[in-house]
């Protein structure tokens, strides 16, 4: 039994983590924590998230001393802001904890990336170099050896799962960059109230055109440039990505299908569509990434869907934890 701590437990992702870990037979939640300044400190998590009533009726505690909080803890999940994770992770790591960071603080091993896209100077180059990028289906062997696992972003998870089999099989024409048009539910903006995500203001609209921080995350880990345009959808949760690519001359629909099958036939949390393409309703509330595609000559359109809070965050973090400690990969997830 592993003692685990969730920091940032009051948010949407933190609540999903609590639910998964509470029912995991190998995990013991020692505490649910939030920042010392949080207005949620001291409240029951089941009051903040009523779906947890009768399941997890414990208070979220203020984190005032990370070194003290780390005592007796084996595993820490950080569902916190990027700069908060940047500051907290090294403290828990120094205490010997294995850390799963759901922020962007350790995803890209390039200090300039953090200055440009996150607005802070990265102060922990050693941990940045040691961090393993937790794209579970592709980095399992590295995850097994890691102390710090940087859980991928929600958009990058779906994009990479959709594109990596095609790139590895050299099916795409490099003369045309993949074009990713992605839509996310409002929960991707977090639980904190703002004008952008208020009920009367929410609309279907693009944002972060040519400067969203997930574009370089996707490009870096795929090893190829992409054009990525995120959109805010007028729904609560889920991500749908429509990806347009150009195939190498002579590549067929069967070649594409075989590339996906070879990559994911033994990956339980990626579901492939033989016919048609997935819809959001098929993944919301579930830990899967669903992928379908269509070919017309040298043109390929791939559609990938996931729940942004689950496969795009909490479920992938728990999946990585299962891989790291040798548990069944889908334990507590399905």
Swiss-Prot record:
Primary location recorded for the protein, binned into one broad class: cytoplasm
Q: Which Gene3D superfamilies match?
A: Dihydrodipicolinate Reductase, domain 2, NAD(P)-binding Rossmann-like Domain
Instruction: Give the active-site positions.
Output: 154
Please, one GO biological process term? L-arginine biosynthetic process
Keywords carried by this UniProt record: Amino-acid biosynthesis, Arginine biosynthesis, Cytoplasm, NADP, Oxidoreductase
Disulphide bond pairs: none
Q: Where in the cell is it found?
A: Cytoplasm
Please write the reaction equations for the catalytic activity of this protein: N-acetyl-L-glutamate 5-semialdehyde + phosphate + NADP(+) = N-acetyl-L-glutamyl 5-phosphate + NADPH + H(+)
Cite a GO CC annotation: cytoplasm
The organism's superkingdom is given as: Bacteria
Known SUPFAM superfamilies for this protein? Glyceraldehyde-3-phosphate dehydrogenase-like, C-terminal domain, NAD(P)-binding Rossmann-fold domains
Which NCBIfam families does this one have?
A: argC
Which HAMAP family does this chain map to?
Answer: ArgC_type1
Instruction: Relate the protein's function as given in its record.
Output: Catalyzes the NADPH-dependent reduction of N-acetyl-5-glutamyl phosphate to yield N-acetyl-L-glutamate 5-semialdehyde.
Similarity comment text for this entry: Belongs to the NAGSA dehydrogenase family. Type 1 subfamily.
Task: Indicate what this protein is called per its UniProt record.
Answer: N-acetyl-gamma-glutamyl-phosphate reductase
């Amino acid at each position: 039994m592993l003692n685990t701590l969730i920091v940032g437990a009051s948010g949407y992702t933190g609540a999903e983590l609590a639910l998964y870990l509470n029912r995991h037979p190998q995990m013991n939640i020692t505490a649910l924590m939030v920042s010392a300044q949080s207005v949620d400190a001291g409240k029951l998590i089941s009051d903040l998230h009523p779906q947890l009533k009768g399941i997890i009726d414990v208070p979220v505690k203020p984190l005032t001393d990370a070194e003290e909080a780390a005592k007796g803890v084996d595993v820490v999940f950080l569902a916190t802001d990027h700069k908060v994770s940047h500051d907290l992770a090294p403290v828990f790591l120094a205490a010997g904890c294995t850390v799963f960071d759901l922020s962007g603080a350790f995803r890209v091993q390039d200090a300039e990336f953090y200055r440009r896209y996150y607005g802070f100077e990265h102060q922990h180059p050693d941990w940045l170099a040691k961090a393993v990028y937790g794209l579970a289906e592709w980095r399992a062997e590295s995850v097994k050896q890691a102390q710090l696992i940087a859980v991928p972003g929600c958009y990058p998870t779906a994009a990479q799962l959709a594109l990596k089999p095609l790139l590895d099989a050299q099916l795409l024409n490099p003369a045309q960059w993949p074009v990713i048009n992605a839509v996310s539910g409002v929960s991707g903006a977090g639980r904190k109230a703002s004008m952008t995500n208020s009920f009367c203001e929410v609309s279907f609209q693009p944002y972060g055109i040519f400067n969203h921080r997930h574009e370089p995350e996707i490009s870096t880990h795929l090893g190829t440039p992409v054009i990525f345009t995120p959109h805010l959808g007028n729904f609560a949760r889920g991500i749908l990505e429509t990806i347009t690519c150009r195939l190498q001359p002579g590549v067929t629909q069967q070649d594409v299908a075989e590339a996906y099958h070879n990559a994911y036939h033994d990956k339980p949390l990626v579901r492939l569509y033989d016919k048609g393409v997935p819809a959001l309703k098929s993944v919301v509330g579930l830990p899967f990434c669903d992928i379908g595609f269509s070919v017309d000559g040298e043109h390929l359109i791939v559609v990938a869907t996931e729940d942004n809070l689950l496969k795009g965050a909490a479920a992938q973090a728990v999946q990585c934890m299962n891989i790291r400690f040798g548990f069944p990969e889908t334990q507590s997830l399905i």
